Each structure stands twice: as C-alpha cells, then as structure tokens.
Design a protein with these regions (language model features):
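Conserved small/polar residues in nucleotide/adenosyl-binding loops
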Residues: 162-164
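Active-site phosphate-binding/coordination module
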Residues: 25-133
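Residue-level recognition of oxygen-bearing side chains
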Residues: 22
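Short loop/turn microsegments at loop-to-beta-strand junctions
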Residues: 4-6, 61
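Acidic, His- and aromatic-enriched active-site or binding-groove loops in soluble protein domains
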Residues: 124-149
C-alpha cells in the first residue's frame, strides 16, 4: 500500500483541513488506518500548538508535528515541544528594530517552558486585532500588551508578523 521508509507531511490550511477548518471524518478514518498500518505521517503548519492541537484531535499521530513554520517540533501526546529553533537574540533585536522603523507592530513570541507568551504593543492593523481575538483564550498561549517589545536572553524568541 505504501513505502514504509517514506515520511508523508501535510500542511493543514488549504490541504488537510476542509473549508470549515476541520479534518473530515473520512480523512481521519483513512489516515488513522494507514498510520495504524505503519504509515509515517505528520503535519507541518504555520500554526502554534494551541491552534493546531484542536484541529488534529481526530488523528492518531505517532510522530511529532512541525509548528510555526518549522520553529517548533511538538509532541502532540505529551503536549510539549521536542525541539525549538529560536531566533538568536541579536537577530530578534535587529528584526524588531526594522519593524519599529517601518511602524509595523508584530507579535513577539517567547517560549516560556511550554507556554507561548505573545507580546504586542498595539492591535493595529485590523488583522492583528482579529488574530488576538481568535486566540486570546488559548490554554497554552498568553497575550500581553507591553509599551515596548524587548528581547531577553533567557527565553527563546520567536517572531510572527500578522500585518495585512
């Protein structure tokens, strides 16, 4: 049926998910059968754990998932990162300086143990406000409005830009 030395990776949005942002019962059944028979399957997405986890509940994923465009490798069963590849503090500071020069307000993500801390200075443009409103109650993501985005050396830095 399939090659047992091949890893299959699917995106979520626009690929695995329906237009309603769900994994269909048919897709879940087919994938779970293939996974039970030895298929190496996982997903890669720009989403964070708090956004991806509810969408993947129907799947019996045995492999870690790739989150935040490859920044985080995450174990869905243990609900914890396996690997994090943060931005170096100097690079994060340089990126924030560029955003500030161009009057762009990004979300600045820091990983504090298993919690994603999302700092921001304002909820403009409208896309930033919508992003915040749709995710502000996520269990493993905490939003904090700050006067100034500051990079610290004690927590991995992850930048995300929601700006349309």
């Amino acid at each position: 049926m399939h090659n047992l030395d091949t890893l299959y990776i699917s995106d979520l949005d626009g690929t695995l998910l329906t237009p309603e942002c769900k994994v269909s019962d048919e897709t879940a059944s087919a994938l779970n059968t293939m996974i039970a028979n030895g298929l190496f399957f996982t997903v890669a997405t720009a989403r964070s754990a708090s956004s991806a986890a509810p969408l993947l509940e129907k799947l019996n994923l045995r492999l870690p998932v790739i989150l935040m465009n490859g920044v985080v490798i995450y174990d869905m069963e243990k609900r914890e990162p396996v690997s994090v590849c943060p931005i170096e503090p100097e690079a994060a500071r340089a990126a924030l300086a560029i955003f500030e020069r161009h009057h762009i307000a990004p979300f600045y993500n820091r990983l504090n143990q298993n919690t994603l801390e999302v700092c921001f200075t304002q909820l403009k443009p409208e896309a930033n406000r919508k992003y915040y409103e749709s995710r502000k109650n996520a269990p493993d993501k905490h939003f904090t409005m700050v006067n100034h985005l500051t990079v610290t050396n004690d927590m991995p830095s992850l930048l995300s830009l929601i700006h349309i």
